[in-house]
């Protein structure tokens, strides 16, 4: 078989952004359509895209805060309206936009009385605060507030460790999820065999990226997951008996095992399980109780050995012999070697 390089979609699919708006600095909305799709394809794409949008896109957030002379997370500081815990929760909500990789340091250093907001965060040039008005703390007295911050790019949700650091730093639940929500719906049109579908995809983001950017990144991530299958070569699959990495999927014997009879030497017999056979439930259960799970296990026994199995009858042995002869051209010896 000649393998052709896949250069793109073979169908004339078109996508379009039909609605886009910014409800606030931290809430963007986009609505997209993809068509024409065959029946069932819209749901397949919609489910995959939603999972990729919610779980595969990286985001940047504050993961740790450090301040001196703070005994514990639930303590209060004179001259600050919020407790340390409330300040950490406010830092958790800060939305950042960046393309950094790894960990970066940032800081807050202000003097009261004043209101501390995200605008007061001193961050690297590669990090941008999406909404500078986000509240962090209220200083009610002329005191200094200095907080060291750790910024990290990741994906998904990572809970903080419960143990506080000895150096006065406190971990923050990392919510690296730029997409706040994603939904898909399907519109069908046409009649009979000509029925087609339109996929509607709705995306809400936190402002660190637009819905269109999120759609592009999710699509790239999905493509990256499937690329290995495009380059997989069938001849690389090894069926040697000494490698127990390949399991023959369940199949019915009359049709699928016809080919197995011709190629029995190429397939690891220990990877063919007896539950893939046509053996009656009673015979199957007796074999399992005797720790006979694979075809290789079965062939390691003689007819005499099988007759020693508890509750095993001569009819059961005959059934096994018929199955082996019919589908594998294999016979069991009457006695042990």
Curated annotation (Swiss-Prot):
Gene3D superfamilies from the UniProt entry: 5' to 3' exonuclease, C-terminal subdomain (1.10.150.20), DNA-directed RNA polymerase, insert domain (2.170.120.12), RNA polymerase, RBP11-like subunit (3.30.1360.10)
SUPFAM superfamilies the UniProt entry points to: C-terminal domain of RNA polymerase alpha subunit, Insert subdomain of RNA polymerase alpha subunit, RBP11-like subunits of RNA polymerase
Main subcellular location: plastid
Key word Transcription present: yes
Enzyme Commission (EC) number: 2.7.7.6
Keywords in alphabetical order: Chloroplast, DNA-directed RNA polymerase, Nucleotidyltransferase, Plastid, Transcription, Transferase
Pfam families the record matches: RNA_pol_A_bac, RNA_pol_A_CTD, RNA_pol_L
Substrates-to-products reaction catalysed: RNA(n) + a ribonucleoside 5'-triphosphate = RNA(n+1) + diphosphate
UniProt subcellular location: Plastid, Chloroplast
Function: DNA-dependent RNA polymerase catalyzes the transcription of DNA into RNA using the four ribonucleoside triphosphates as substrates.
Subunit comment: In plastids the minimal PEP RNA polymerase catalytic core is composed of four subunits: alpha, beta, beta', and beta''. When a (nuclear-encoded) sigma factor is associated with the core the holoenzyme is formed, which can initiate transcription.
Record remark on domains: The N-terminal domain is essential for RNAP assembly and basal transcription, whereas the C-terminal domain is involved in interaction with transcriptional regulators and with upstream promoter elements.
Name listed for the protein in its UniProt record: DNA-directed RNA polymerase subunit alpha
Gene: rpoA
